[in-house]
Curated annotation (Swiss-Prot):
CDD domains: YqeH (cd01855). Changing residue 579 to R: In a breast cancer sample; somatic mutation. Residues 202-503 form the CP-type G domain. It comes from the Eukaryota. Gene3D superfamilies: P-loop containing nucleotide triphosphate hydrolases. Residues 102-126 have a biased composition (Basic and acidic residues). Involved in regulation of mitochondrial protein translation and respiration. Plays a role in mitochondria-mediated cell death. May act as a scaffolding protein or stabilizer of respiratory chain supercomplexes. Binds GTP. The gene is NOA1. This is Nitric oxide-associated protein 1. Homodimer or multimer. Interacts with mitochondrial complex I, DAP3, MRPL12 and MRPS27. The modification Phosphotyrosine is found at residue 77. It is a peripheral membrane protein.
């Protein structure tokens, strides 16, 4: 075994070198110092070296190096470079990464699905159970007027047992509570079918109208449904009452020519006369036609006081407010405060919308406007199931004077002078209707003012108290207001009656989703097509017109909901197209595929012969598909057309004189290589607002 000093001696000999080498490179001491310094620095930088204990060695020949240490050094260990991953390994890692990302996506997708399921369960909370043992509450639903109960889910006014008991035990009880059906209609546009027959509707309305005392009837008519909107049994239902006919939804009809609203009003007068209503003397409509010979026992000349008399006919839009302020002024001037007022009409005529509009107007007392909830509004027929009411404001001279001042001030305001909120509201209404009006309030009930009054005034005494005038404003009090016995003492009421269901109506065959598509909610944009004999027009899968014979082409203008599809095909392909696409996307209504069409009534044909054409700019007839809309037909001059119309079995196909005879002119250029024309929407008009140039719309 070698001695421990041997490595050091070998190192010393190596460093000492030979004399010639030392002579060539200079003195040995500097070289030794440099190498020792390098060794020392290398020792400190290395983590693998270790310092040896000092041992004196022979330093002869090193000069003054007796205190020098010798160190044993290891070079720093450097790891070998890792080999580069192979292509197979890279592909494997990439595949694992993709699988992990896909797993995370699947997890997020499943979480979103669970959230949607929970959200849908909240959107359709038809939960709870009925309890036939609990008696009815005696409190009416504030949305539809039905008595609240928890006995049967198919009876109007139903609340689940849990909700019924929880609400009854809370503060305030069931007051101002809506039933389950109204809640679903208001929040989710979802309707529950109820077991209410047409006879029950008629019995309820007839009992209300035959209450003792003077009363006025406002009969609301859907202009889109003329002449079917006028009920044939209306005189027997109303009895010897004074009647004002309101043509609603005028905002949905475009202006086909100047003076179209006056023509619509005259048309409504004519339809009232055809329906057997007695027109009041001095009216501006046509004279009542002569009836057939009276039957045995019938008075050939019944007195006017025993008949239903039409006092006036007006066009309004309960949604956009057009004509509502004029209606209020007419009621306050003519009827004043002589008795109750009843709003009557068929289902989906817009009665509840007008009820809510009048509730926020001068026709309702200021306190009643804040104390009574709004009626439920929905396109689903039969929303109102019982009587809703609000107290009518007594039109005293002072109130009439203040109202006239407000209306005069409003008419001088330009649209740019209105508040931003009111401008936004009017802009929204312009998108929904062709004519828009403003409905405001002159007086606002103030709860703070009431607290300062030592005792309660009734409506009349408060109107004549000049020191305690009702506060002007447009915002409702945030506090809950309740009508007291003094408020309703000797009051006259405005009643919203349930809608009378129409027989042979196509809406009775449709689901709630289909009703929302068929019934128009925005201004109707007419769609015009030029057809040749042998062509067929489909209005969804609920209406069809075959062009069988004619000397020339004719124009067919569809006046229906803008989202109800229209499809044109040839006569030899029409049956196959209906069999293939009825219930699917192309025709859209009805929807639900073969299962839906299996229970849907088949289309029934009816031949139609039209009179000679009046030219390319004037229609000769409207072919109306129940409440789904109509097609206005415009043949060429002196051309006679033979058509065939189809509607579902159990519904009515009506051929009437054109309601808008010049509507064919509301079209753009013809689309190249197509039978369709580009649509054109007329502008909307604002009323009771001054234009920019200082001109007032009246």
């Amino acid at each position: 075994m070698l001695p421990a000093r041997l490595p050091f001696r070998l190192l010393s000999l190596f460093l000492r070198g030979s004399a010639p080498t030392a002579a060539r490179h200079g003195l040995r001491e500097p070289l030794l110092e440099r190498r020792c310094a390098a060794a020392s620095s290398f020792q400190h930088s290395s983590s693998l070296g270790r310092e040896l204990p000092y041992d004196p060695v022979d330093t002869e020949g090193f000069g003054e190096g007796g205190d020098m240490q010798e160190r044993f050094l290891f070079p720093e260990y450097i790891l070998d470079p890792e080999p580069q991953p192979t292509r197979e390994k890279q592909l494997q890692e990439l595949q694992q990464q993709q699988e992990e990302e896909e797993r995370q996506r699947q997890q997020r997708r499943e979480e979103r699905r669970q959230q949607n399921l929970r959200a849908r369960s909240r959107e359709h909370p038809v939960v709870g159970h009925p309890d036939p043992a609990l008696p009815p509450s005696g409190v009416n639903c504030s949305g539809c007027g039905a008595e609240l109960h928890c006995q049967d889910a198919g009876v109007p006014g139903y609340l689940p047992r849990e909700k019924f008991l929880r609400t009854a035990e809370a503060d305030g009880g069931l007051a101002r509570t809506v039933c389950q059906r109204c809640w679903l209609l208001s929040h989710h546009r979802r309707a529950l079918r109820l077991q209410v027959s047409r006879e029950q509707y008629l019995e309820l309305v007839s009992a209300a109208l035959r209450r003792p005392g003077p009363s006025l009837v406002l009969y609301m008519v859907d202009l889109l449904d003329l002449p079917d909107a006028l009920l044939p049994d209306l005189p027997a239902l109303v009895g010897p009452k004074q009647l004002i006919v309101l043509g609603n939804k005028v905002d949905l009809l475009p202006q086909d020519a100047p003076g179209y609203r006056q023509r619509l009003r005259e048309r409504l007068w004519e339809d009232c006369a055809r329906a057997g209503l007695l027109l009041a003397p001095g009216h501006q409509g046509p004279q009542r036609p002569v009836k057939d010979e009276p039957q045995d026992g019938e008075n050939p000349n019944p007195p006017n006081w025993s008949r239903t008399v039409v006092r006036d006919v007006r066009l309004i839009s309960a949604k956009t407010g057009y004509g509502v302020e004029e209606l209020i002024s007419a009621l306050q001037r003519s009827w004043r405060y002589r008795g109750d007022v009843y709003l009557v009409g068929a289902t989906n005529a817009g009665k509840s919308t007008l009820f809510n509009t009048l509730l926020e107007s001068d026709y309702c007392t200021a306190k009643g406007s804040e104390a009574i909830d709004r009626a439920t509004i929905s396109p689903w027929p039969g929303t109102t199931l019982n009587l809703l009411k609000f107290p009518i404001c007594n039109p005293t001279p002072y109130r009439m004077f203040k109202r006239h001042q407000r209306l005069k001030k409003d008419s001088t305001q330009a649209e740019e002078d209105l508040s931003e909120q009111e401008q936004n509201q009017l802009n929204v209404l312009k998108k929904h209707g062709y004519v828009v009006g403003r409905v405001g309030r002159t007086f606002l009930y103030s709860e703070e003012q009431k607290d300062n009054i030592p005792f309660e005034f009734d409506a009349d005494s408060l109107a004549f108290d000049m020191e305690n005038d009702p506060v002007m404003g447009t915002h409702k009090s945030t506090k809950q207001v309740e009508l007291t016995a003094q408020d309703v003492k000797d009051a006259h009421w405005f009643y919203d009656t349930p809608g009378i269901t129409k027989e042979n109506c196509i809406l009775n065959l449709l689901t709630e989703k289909e009703v929302n598509i068929v019934l128009p909610t925005q201004s109707i944009v007419p769609r015009t097509f030029v057809l040749k004999p042998g062509m067929v027009l489909f209005l969804g899968a609920i209406g069809r017109i075959d062009f069988l014979q004619g000397n020339q082409s004719a124009w067919f203008t569809v006046v229906a909901s803008n989202i109800l599809p229209v499809h044109i095909t040839s006569l030899d392909r029409a049956d196959a197209l209906y069999q293939k696409h009825a219930g699917h996307t192309l025709l859209q209504i009805p929807m639900g595929g073969k299962e839906r069409m299996a229970g849907f009534p088949p289309l029934v044909a009816e031949d139609i012969m039209l009179k000679e054409g009046l030219g390319a700019s004037e229609a000769v007839a409207d072919i109306k598909f129940s409440s789904a809309g109509w097609v206005s037909v415009t043949p060429n001059f002196k051309d006679r057309l033979h058509l065939r119309g189809y509607t579902p079995e159990g519904t009515v196909l009506t051929v009437r004189p054109p309601l808008l005879p010049y509507i064919v002119n509301i079209k753009g250029q013809r689309i190249k290589k197509s039978v369709a024309y580009k649509t054109k929407k007329p502008p909307s008009l604002m009323y009771n607002v001054r234009k920019k140039k200082g001109k007032i719309n009246v």
